[in-house]
A protein has these predicted regions:
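Histidine-centered active-site microenvironments of extracellular/periplasmic hydrolases
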Residues: 1-73, 79, 161, 165-168, ...
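Structured segments of extracytoplasmic/periplasmic soluble domains
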Residues: 5, 9-12, 96-104, 125, ...
Length: 316
């Protein structure tokens, strides 16, 4: 968000305007505490990604994906405090742990046949700093921001700006402008070589399509909040109808596992066994301190509270 947020859910619910500068100042001492669900302002987020371009969600550029990693294994790594430059990806972590433990890749987990792991173990680099890297190709994609790493080179395109969640004019994927960087000389992606080396750029663009096809990243989808709803995202709607029954002992249910009551009136009916003492406790709740509602008993009286994003509560 441009100005940051005390409660990120306000932005997701189209109510960022409720967090006025005066409100933010009044909460200053609570930022970073359990009372906040805060979100960095764009300027600070970008500054913390220096010297890379862009921020999270912009998976095309290193500012949206690249992070330092510390591996601690006193009995397995001979050198102390060494650095490694081989390209690695988060999908390499599990293969690395399995190889280090001398375990095979699991074929089944809890009776479910597993897809083959797509990463490459990093173990070879732990005691061989100059060993050629083994993870040579990797695609990236998020909300249409996409790119590919290929043997030190990266071809990337920023499709949408993450903090413009409403009203952003989207260009066609085919009209996105691609950039080309030589990671062996320009690790911060500062010097675009796309105009000097168009043939290599086209080769890497084609390689992106090959990788994205192989690993089910197509078709590209640049929607954001629309993905939260199964109906608009294209996922199966697990709950049909306009009512749902719950029973004692049921644990936490995800939002897509319960009937949607967004932007509509609703009623709750509960059968409760009362003891001899005044009842206290939650009967049913959805959400929490950062937004939601709850039906509960307090001192033997039935209560209902609607919490607007932690900014205001409407109790009855």
């Amino acid at each position: 968000t441009l100005n940051g947020a005390f409660n990120e859910m306000a932005n997701f619910n189209g109510m960022a305007a409720l967090e006025t500068p005066e409100f933010m100042l009044s909460k200053m001492d609570e930022f970073g505490s359990p009372e906040s669900y805060n979100h960095y302002a764009v300027g600070w987020a970008w500054a913390m990604d220096t010297p890379y371009q862009w921020t999270k969600q912009v998976a095309s550029h290193w500012g949206g994906t690249r992070n330092g990693t510390i591996v601690h294994w006193p009995t397995g790594i001979q050198e102390q405090g060494g650095l490694r430059t081989q390209f690695c990806h988060v999908i390499d972590v599990a293969p690395t742990i399995l190889e280090a433990a001398g375990l095979p890749e699991p074929i089944q987990v809890n009776g479910v046949t597993q897809s083959p792991m797509e990463g490459a173990s990093m173990l070879y680099s732990f005691n061989q700093a100059d060993e050629p890297e083994r993870h040579e190709v990797q695609y990236f994609e998020m909300f249409g921001n996409r790119g590919i790493y290929y043997k030190g080179w990266s071809a990337v395109t920023k499709h949408r700006t993450p903090w413009q969640m409403v009203g952003q004019k989207m260009v066609a994927f085919g009209d996105d402008i691609w950039e080309l960087y030589d990671g062996s000389k320009d690790w911060s992606q500062a010097h675009d070589l796309s105009k000097e080396m168009p043939d290599l750029l086209h080769k890497l663009q084609r390689q992106f399509l090959i990788e994205a096809t192989q690993y089910n990243a197509l078709p590209l989808d640049d929607r954001q909040v629309e993905r939260l709803l199964p109906q608009t995202a294209g996922r199966p709607t697990l709950i049909q109808g306009d009512s749902q029954q719950f029973f004692p002992g049921m644990g936490r249910l995800s939002e897509s596992s319960v009937v949607s009551i967004k932007n509509k009136s609703f009623s709750v009916t509960a059968e409760v066994e009362m003891g001899s003492q005044p009842a206290n406790g939650v009967i049913i709740a959805q959400g929490g301190k950062f937004g939601g509602w709850s039906v509960y008993a307090k001192d033997g009286k039935l209560k209902f509270t609607y919490n607007v994003l932690g900014i205001h509560e409407f109790p009855t």
